A protein has these predicted regions:
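Conserved thiamine diphosphate
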Residues: 1-30, 189
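Glycine- and acidic-residue-enriched helix-capping/beta->alpha junction motif
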Residues: 27, 31-33, 138-142
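Thiamine diphosphate
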Residues: 40-190
Length: 190
C-alpha cells in the first residue's frame, strides 16, 4: 500500500506468467515510473504465455472466474488462493466471481463496482497486513460507490498485525488461505 500513496507511480502486481510478460513489457514502455512487484511465490508457476507482443494496460483488472453470489478481489499470489476457494465454494453451491486487479495503482474501480452491483457481496483478500493495507482503500471506495447494492458488510482478509516469521509453518499460519476465504464467504452468504 505504501507505493500507492506516491502520485504518478504505477504499481503492477502480476499473478500469472502471461500477466507477468504483458505487465513487464508495458512497464518498460511506460512514460510514468512503475513499481513492479513480482511475488517470489510465483517464480515456479508455469502457464501459457503468448508468443506475440502483449502489452497489458495499467488499471484494467482480469476477471479470473465469473460468479453471481459474491465477489472476491485480490492480486498477485493471493489470486490463486481465491480461485482455490472459489472451487470449494462452488461445490457448496456458492458462485464466486474472482477479480485479479493486476495493478494497485491505477486500480480498476469500474470492474469491481460492476461485479459488486451484481453480487451484493465483497471479500478483499491479500497478503499484506489488514490494518492500513490496500484492501482498506478498496473497501472504502466500494462501500461508497455500491452502498445501496451491498447485502452484507465488506470483508477484508489479510495478515494480522504481527511480525512475519522466517519459519515456513509460522509464515503460513498468518497467510490468507483458501479455507479462511471459504469460511468468510459462507458467513457472508448466511
Amino acid at each position: 500500500a505504501w507505493y500507492t500513496h506516491i502520485p504518478g507511480l504505477v504499481v503492477a502486481v502480476p499473478s500469472t506468467p502471461a500477466d507477468n510478460k504483458g505487465l513487464l513489457k508495458a512497464a518498460i514502455r511506460a512514460d510514468d515510473p512503475v513499481v513492479y512487484m513480482e511475488h517470489k511465490g510465483l517464480w515456479g508457476i508455469e502457464g501459457e504465455v503468448p508468443d506475440e507482443e502483449v502489452l497489458l494496460p495499467f488499471g484494467r483488472a482480469r476477471i479470473a472466474r465469473t460468479g453471481g453470489d459474491l465477489t472476491l478481489v485480490s492480486w498477485s499470489a493471493t489470486v490463486a488462493v481465491c480461485e482455490q476457494a472459489a472451487l470449494t465454494l462452488e461445490a457448496k453451491g456458492i458462485s464466486a466471481e474472482v477479480i485479479d486487479l493486476r495493478t494497485l495503482w491505477p486500480w480498476d474501480i469500474d470492474t469491481v463496482v460492476t461485479s459488486v452491483e451484481k453480487t451484493g457481496r465483497l471479500i478483499v483478500a491479500h497478503e499484506a497486513v489488514t490494518v492500513g493495507g490496500f484492501g482498506a482503500e478498496i473497501a472504502a471506495t466500494i462501500g461508497t460507490e455500491c452502498f445501496s447494492s451491498l447485502k452484507t458488510p465488506i470483508i477484508r482478509l489479510g495478515a494480522p498485525r504481527v511480525p512475519i516469521s522466517y519459519a515456513p509453518p509460522l509464515e503460513d499460519a498468518i497467510r490468507v488461505s483458501a479455507e479462511s476465504i471459504t469460511t468468510a464467504a459462507e458467513a457472508a452468504m448466511a
